[in-house]
Amino acid sequence: MKIKLSAALLFAFLLLTGCRVEMATEQVHPIPKPTGIKVDIAGTVMLQEKELIVEGQTNLPKDAIMYAGIKEYGDHESYARVINAKAEEFEEYIAEGTGKVNDEGQFQIRIDRINPKKRYKLEVLFNPAIQKSKIQEIYGMTGENIRTNIGYTEFKHNGNFVNGMIKVAPIVNIDDYSGNGFKWNLTDVFQGKSRPLQ
């Protein structure tokens, strides 16, 4: 027994001496500052019987185009899964709308609520590929000048990859709690959950 224990300790000692860390020779590299232009988007969506009204605030320049679309969840997806961002939505937008940023950085987008008895995922996007040339000069045609931060996403537009910014919100069934006459906050895809505000 003592021989086995001694052999195990010797083996562990030899193994650990070969795994030492040499910290004195490591060089510390400074963390580079983020490059690019930071895009901030915040807002809400008002759920009405026949229409969804997105109201937002951004640091984008005047006349930047904001896009919004809804994707349907399957009938099997529950209220809890939808509001907790666990549900799987279909890939295609079934209703879309756009709005322009004004002088104060505000925008509004109206989308038809196709079927109030269904649940949807709302996506609000800044897509550089659909902007006028004066906006594309700032952010790049494919968003190459946008700084990576919360809400930054890559998606396909007309077969090309584009970098942009996204916010989301659940659109619950009109008969669900807070499904009609309530505002929901727009949130980041991976950072928290949208909740009703009123």
Kindly give the residue locations of the regions a language model identified:
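Structural beta-strand segments of beta-rich domains
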Residues: 50-54
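C-terminal motif of bacterial Sec signal peptides marking the signal peptidase cleavage site
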Residues: 15-18
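Ser/Thr-rich low-complexity repeats and stalk/linker segments
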Residues: 29, 33-47, 60-180, 189-198
